[in-house]
Amino acid sequence: MTNIRKTHPLMKILNDAFIDLPTPSSISSWWNFGSLLGLCLIMQILTGLFLAMHYTPDTSTAFSSVAHICRDVNYGWLIRYLHANGASMFFICLYAHIGRGLYYGSYMFQETWNIGVLLLLTVMATAFVGYVLPWGQMSFWGATVITNLLSAIPYIGTTLVEWIWGGFSVDKATLTRFFAFHFILPFIITALVAVHLLFLHETGSNNPTGIPSNMDMIPFHPYYTIKDILGALLLILTLLALTLFTPDLLGDPDNYTPANPLSTPAHIKPEWYFLFAYAILRSIPNKLGGVLALLLSILILIFIPMLQTSKQRSMMFRPFSQLLFWTLVADLLTLTWIGGQPVEHPYIIVGQLASILYFLLILVLMPTISLIENKLLKW
């Protein structure tokens, strides 16, 4: 009798995706982040569901309902902080996953890559609307500042902002719709993840060398299931350490003050995972220019397959490209630091230089150095 996992219509899909999937034998721990992102998504949906059972999306009770969750609900404090810090772990895994794709040339699977960029945008949107829900000072002002950026769009900007707000300022209508978005988006993300995997399994995984490995494949189970379990344990350990020892390390103290439209915080800034984009936005003195730079800082990922000039797919054997890649990583860390600093000298000029370098590295320096490396191959 044939095994049920190979004949049952539903089990067959799972079998082909997670059990008998032919996988390159040489993929490193950088390939763990895909499964870790899946784990993060499941954790966020589960903790979010339990939070939604006790949360009230109303301006007069939102803040106190979060306090109620932390004080009165059984293990409510744990669920709340797992959800908040789970978002940080989600973004750490996301950025590592994208970095892996850039380094090893995984972006050459164009459909998978484009769905991935769409996923990144959706996750960022989810995190943004979620940050507004506790209705603290930074929630309110973050929502006001970021939604206000749309007013930079010529002609329709102001109308668009008021339409999103559901009034003339961030108020009850805004909070209610943001809660609705925050609830529905994770399920849209889950559907996109299925499409992401569908496209990936059409081609099979890339590997560190960037060379087709069709002649050297091993089954996903047990080799990579056990490897993914190790990664998952390390992720959960890190998340629990963060949540139980320093739950507020990555949060903003201003969010422990209820939202007050009459009092603006000294420094309005988003969560740490958006700071690099926020720094790029602030480094341009023109509103529309800043918004365009902000958009382009993320959407530039779509153009990366078109900027591939190297004859080799991976950076594994390209030391000059490696140097530029790690310069880009350092540049993004610099932008993240600048995004959290006040707008004053010397941070302004450092932010502007880091922003210019970011676009210069991706659009000019990396494609150029790849061409030079091609020439060196002929020696």
Curated annotation (Swiss-Prot):
Source organism, top-level taxon: Eukaryota
Cofactor(s) named in the record: heme b
SUPFAM superfamilies: a domain/subunit of cytochrome bc1 complex (Ubiquinol-cytochrome c reductase), Transmembrane di-heme cytochromes
Co-factor: note: Binds 2 heme b groups non-covalently.
Subcellular location: Mitochondrion inner membrane
Keyword Electron transport: yes
Molecular-function annotations in GO: metal ion binding; ubiquinol-cytochrome-c reductase activity
Ligand binding (a ubiquinone): H201
Keyword Plastid: no
One Gene Ontology CC term in the entry: respiratory chain complex III
TM helices/strands, residue ranges: 33-53, 77-98, 113-133, 178-198, 226-246, 288-308, 320-340, 347-367
Annotated heme b b562 binding sites: H83, H182
GO BP terms in the entry: mitochondrial electron transport, ubiquinol to cytochrome c
Record-listed heme b b566 binding positions: H97, H196
Topology versus the membrane: Multi-pass membrane protein
CDD domains, alphabetized: cytochrome_b_C (cd00290), Cytochrome_b_N (cd00284)
Keywords noted in UniProt: Electron transport, Heme, Iron, Membrane, Metal-binding, Mitochondrion, Mitochondrion inner membrane, Respiratory chain, Transmembrane, Transmembrane helix, Transport, Ubiquinone
Quaternary structure note: The cytochrome bc1 complex contains 11 subunits: 3 respiratory subunits (MT-CYB, CYC1 and UQCRFS1), 2 core proteins (UQCRC1 and UQCRC2) and 6 low-molecular weight proteins (UQCRH/QCR6, UQCRB/QCR7, UQCRQ/QCR8, UQCR10/QCR9, UQCR11/QCR10 and a cleavage product of UQCRFS1). This cytochrome bc1 complex then forms a dimer.
Family from the record: Belongs to the cytochrome b family.
Function: Component of the ubiquinol-cytochrome c reductase complex (complex III or cytochrome b-c1 complex) that is part of the mitochondrial respiratory chain. The b-c1 complex mediates electron transfer from ubiquinol to cytochrome c. Contributes to the generation of a proton gradient across the mitochondrial membrane that is then used for ATP synthesis.
PANTHER family: CYTOCHROME B
Other notes: Heme 1 (or BL or b562) is low-potential and absorbs at about 562 nm, and heme 2 (or BH or b566) is high-potential and absorbs at about 566 nm.
Protein name (database record): Cytochrome b
Organism: Lagenorhynchus albirostris
Gene coding for it: MT-CYB
